[in-house]
């Protein structure tokens, strides 16, 4: 089987980021984003997606975390897009419901080649620690635009904003894991009647 890995470096005047992903990993993560809460969420993606994920980032955190969080989403999206290559033999679609105590989120993904995000979440507070919850949508928007996927994220219930966020990232990891799984019955086939994604 081909190695489904990718490494992407993104350098701008605002951020310097390197992301490495192995889709057939063991859920190991090496994370240094400079944003501790984001590292915690990225760890959920790796652990529940069973991806090996490395993120090293330096950003203009003296301004705020916006550029760093968004650009990590962009770079992760680019890495995923490279790792899935032509998408032959992939399941393509993935979905997951994940609870954490009172919180429950649903994530559905399609490796469609068409970027689209539906983000239906109302967080119960504006910050988690010192992390602005608006940046969660910015992360996923950056990811979607560069991974070229359709992504639906719905927080169905929750009172604790940390729990809401964590269920979203865990469900995302699990849905993505399902979508990138290879189906031996479709070994050399593109999972689309178009013949291309």
Swiss-Prot record:
Q: Name one GO cellular component term.
A: cytoplasm
Q: Which family does it belong to?
A: Belongs to the imidazoleglycerol-phosphate dehydratase family.
Instruction: Tell me where it resides.
Output: Cytoplasm
Q: Known PANTHER family for this protein? A: IMIDAZOLEGLYCEROL-PHOSPHATE DEHYDRATASE, IMIDAZOLEGLYCEROL-PHOSPHATE DEHYDRATASE HIS7
Q: What class of enzyme is it?
A: lyase
Citing just one GO molecular function, the answer is: imidazoleglycerol-phosphate dehydratase activity
Q: What name has this protein been given in UniProt?
A: Imidazoleglycerol-phosphate dehydratase
Q: What is its main location?
A: cytoplasm
Gene Ontology biological process: L-histidine biosynthetic process
Give the EC number.
4.2.1.19
The pathway entry for this protein reads as: Amino-acid biosynthesis; L-histidine biosynthesis; L-histidine from 5-phospho-alpha-D-ribose 1-diphosphate: step 6/9
